[in-house]
Amino acid sequence: MKKIMTAINNPKLNEELKKEKKFEIVGKDIQYKEAILEILEKNSNIDLIILSEKIPGEIKLEKLIEKIKLMNEKIKIIFILEKENNDLAKILIKNNITDIYYNNKINLNELIKIINKKEINM
């Protein structure tokens, strides 16, 4: 079973993902960047984070990704952008995050298919 953390500022989507039998959603939808690190400190065996650029926090995105990867180098990250942002996409790709989707172009069913296709070393 894939352990998934959501930090998408969308509690409804988090609840819908919890209904999927193949996933274990860890906690509630995270509402700020630093909470991601707090949860990973307690539970580092999470397989996948679904992360949105909308998540507020003091830590810069690049530093957050760096810290996530230090805590769990095998973790996969799906990143949801609000709109096309080439500068942010370049930062994500530089940090080996290639699963980048746009909020207005992805729905729950598509997200579930993407998660099911993700190769996760368990």
Locations of the language-model features?
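Receiver (REC) domain switch/output surface
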Residues: N109-M122
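Short acidic, S/G/P-rich loop/turn micro-motifs used as interaction or catalytic elements
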Residues: N10-N14, L51-K60, K83-N86
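Conserved phosphotransfer cores of two-component systems
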Residues: K42-N43, K69-K74
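A short, hydrophobic beta-strand element within the central beta-sheet of small alpha/beta folds
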Residues: K74-E84
